[in-house]
A protein has these predicted regions:
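Hydrophobic faces of well-ordered beta-strands that scaffold small-molecule active sites
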Residues: 3-8, 32-34, 63-67, 87-89, ...
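Short, charge-patterned binding micro-sites
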Residues: 40-42, 68-71, 82
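Conserved anion-binding
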Residues: 13-16, 58, 74-75, 84-118
Length: 118
């Protein structure tokens, strides 16, 4: 069985983010995971498109933007422009899940779907 290792930059020390990204790549991580939180769908707030855009050319790793936001369809094109390869959305975050998935695919991106078990 093949495994995909996708470390989240949410746990990175941003003072040395480039070094930590290189370390993940050197240790076999082909993906980087971006936990994007809006403070509404989930209580925390993290980073958005500017962080992804600033680092996507610094690595060959696949960029997975995990959108923990309300109505993620609003952000699909912006994350594509920022350098995302995959956009993962939450089933519970959207009234138009099928349309959001279609938009992600229309942008040429891969789709991930998260389901909250609670």
């Amino acid at each position: 069985m093949d495994y995909i290792l996708a470390p989240s930059i949410l746990s990175a020390d941003f003072k040395v983010l480039g070094e930590q990204m290189k370390l993940t790549e050197d240790n076999g991580a082909k993906y980087l995971h971006f936990d994007v939180m809006d403070g509404m769908f989930v209580p925390s707030i993290s980073f958005g498109m500017p962080v992804l855009k600033s680092i996507h050319n610094a690595t060959d790793q696949v960029m997975d933007a995990h959108l923990m936001v309300q109505e993620p369809i609003r952000y699909v094109e912006a994350f594509k422009e920022a350098g995302a390869d995959i956009v993962t959305i939450h089933l519970e975050a959207s009234e138009v899940v099928n349309a959001t998935i279609a938009k992600i695919r229309a942008c040429g991106l891969n789709v991930g779907l998260s389901i909250c078990p609670a």
